Amino acid sequence: MKRMIALDGAQGEGGGQILRSALSLSMITGQPFTITGIRAGRAKPGLLRQHLTAVKAAAEICRATVEGAELGSQRLVFRPGTVRGGDYRFAIGSAGSCTLVLQTVLPALWFADGPSRVEVSGGTDNPSAPPADFIRRVLEPLLAKIGVHQQTTLLRHGFYPAGGGVVATEVSPVASFNSLQLGERGNIVQMRGEVLLAGVPRHVAEREIATLAASFSLHEQAVHSLPRDQGPGNTVSLEVESENITERFFVVGEKRVSAEVVAAQLVKEVKRYLASPAAVGEYLADQLVLPMALAGTGEFTVAHPSCHLLTNIAVVERFLPVRFGLIETDGVTRVSIE
């Protein structure tokens, strides 16, 4: 019997990433774990609907036995079984993030006995989670370089707080992992601004695009008007395509916040990324830790290692026989497998 790994949910940033990473790694390695203090660092601690959906999805895919899988629970025991490929559907029942549920279960399906399709309904444009377009246009091309073949499709948008969105991913077992080397971003090739609207006046998008264009030379500007029943909602994105990597940044519009202020938040975030020669943005860095650890090799550079990133690394090192090295030089941190 494999040893039970004990995790403290309050460590590091004290959020849901500890649980999601632990679920992924437990499914992959077959190691059971117990976690206490789930989301202890949040205003509303314990399992919310999206976290509970991730737990139940993981349990279904690997036929795990679980204790503590209920709303508000701050303690969970997870004993995994064998990961099985198949056609899975999960409903969050709120505007909780579809992509964070997918992020939990997809890595395990890289090791399944056959191809899989996973469909999740809930929120797709959530201020605290990567949207589906980030997964499709930024993460999945990098995963392909590592040897992971998965394809995410956004079937219907679901804005916070209403939800109602649907995201599906098709994934195949990985034959072998490759090393990802992202030391340098390279020169910028082009920048693209994009606005999504649902039940929001078009002039909002025009003002947001104008704010982006005042700070950056945009090679493309796009406004996509969605059916009103998918809203109300508004998301502004800016994609930076460089020689070695494409990064995408986004801000979700809020009620009583002007279009100019929303877009200015995005401008600030992109300028912070471009001010450093680091290849990877803060949020993408979190997503690369697990696949890089599974490959057992690779490196990337990031301007500042976030608490989220450091917490994720700590959890990965509990489950896998790898060690990460972080070396800071001239304001850039190089993250690599030692």
Swiss-Prot record:
One Pfam family in the UniProt entry: RTC_insert
Cytoplasm is among the record's keywords: yes
GO molecular function, one term: ATP binding
Catalytic reaction list: a 3'-end 3'-phospho-ribonucleotide-RNA + ATP = a 3'-end 2',3'-cyclophospho-ribonucleotide-RNA + AMP + diphosphate
Keywords: ATP-binding, Cytoplasm, Ligase, Nucleotide-binding
Enzyme class: ligase
Keyword Repeat: no
InterPro entries in alphabetical order: RNA3'-term_phos_cycl_insert (IPR013791), RNA3'_phos_cyclase_dom (IPR023797), RNA3'_phos_cyclase_dom_sf (IPR037136), RNA3'_term_phos_cyc (IPR000228), RNA3'_term_phos_cyc_type_1 (IPR017770), RNA3'_term_phos_cycl-like_CS (IPR020719), RNA3'P_cycl/enolpyr_Trfase_a/b (IPR013792), RPTC_insert (IPR036553)
PROSITE patterns recorded: RTC
GO terms, biological process: RNA processing
EC number: 6.5.1.4
One of the record's GO cellular component terms: cytoplasm
Positions of ATP binding: 103, 283-287
Subcellular location field: Cytoplasm
Active site: 308
Function: Catalyzes the conversion of 3'-phosphate to a 2',3'-cyclic phosphodiester at the end of RNA. The mechanism of action of the enzyme occurs in 3 steps: (A) adenylation of the enzyme by ATP; (B) transfer of adenylate to an RNA-N3'P to produce RNA-N3'PP5'A; (C) and attack of the adjacent 2'-hydroxyl on the 3'-phosphorus in the diester linkage to produce the cyclic end product. The biological role of this enzyme is unknown but it is likely to function in some aspects of cellular RNA processing.
Similarity comment: Belongs to the RNA 3'-terminal cyclase family. Type 1 subfamily.
Name recorded for this polypeptide: RNA 3'-terminal phosphate cyclase
Naturally occurring in which organism (per UniProt): Escherichia coli O6:K15:H31 (strain 536 / UPEC)
